[in-house]
Amino acid sequence: MKNCVGDHTVIVPVMNGADPADRVRGYLSHGTVIDSLIYIVAFANADFSVTQQDQFANLHVGIQNASEAQWESILSVSRLLNGAGIDCEADRDIQAEIWKKYILNCAYNVETALYDNTIGQLRSDPKKAAEYEALVEEAYQVALAKGIHVEPKHRDAILHRFYYELADNATSSLQRDVKAGRQTELETFSGYIVKESKRLHIPAPVSERMYGQLGEICHKDGKAGTK
């Protein structure tokens, strides 16, 4: 891919996690890499088709502290995608948007995968619901320590979504991958937050415990690796 990238190339990695654009930047010395996140419920089928659940697919793009030239590239991407019928919003504070979704996934993906429970099963169990809250709080505290502009209202909105908005039968991609014995995004949804919590000296005992437990499940009998 490096040989295809020039100074005017614009790359928009649409991937899970808090740092995919930074990782792409580490591989490339040219071009503009734009951070992004997407809100969508979709999964791949055995025949390689993709099923989208619900009716939303909202993409956000941006670069933190973008220069004037970078912002023009971001706006060009937004105009291009909106013109193609893709709901795309350009965000000045893209890291806040990324982390609002990432904090949710640090709880949503991790706990559904560990217990192989739906969201309805988690929130109907007081102990598991309390663990979900702890996972959210730990990721939120890491975000604050990193200087991300998240506020208590954002954390509270994530918890409100858990208790009152998510469907009872909702599952996660990590849960489905672990159950099927496929490669997983455990490092994306759990390993990264545990690593950052240690680096920043932020206590994250529930995240650390579940990361260890899921790691054992994923590697049991060579059943599944991690991406």
Regions found by a protein language model. Name each.
Residues 2, 82-83, 133-227:
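NAD(P)-dependent Rossmann-like dehydrogenase/reductase catalytic/cofactor-binding core
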Residues 1-49:
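Rossmann-like NAD(P)(H) cofactor-binding subdomain of soluble oxidoreductases
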Residues 19-21, 43, 98, 160, ...:
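Generic structural signal for helix capping and beta-alpha/helix-loop junctions
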Residues 44, 114-115, 218-222:
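Short amphipathic alpha-helical interaction/hinge segments
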Residues 3-6, 27-32, 47-153:
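Internal alpha-helical scaffold of NAD(P)-dependent oxidoreductase catalytic cores
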Residues 18, 63, 182:
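Gly/Ser/Thr-rich helix-start
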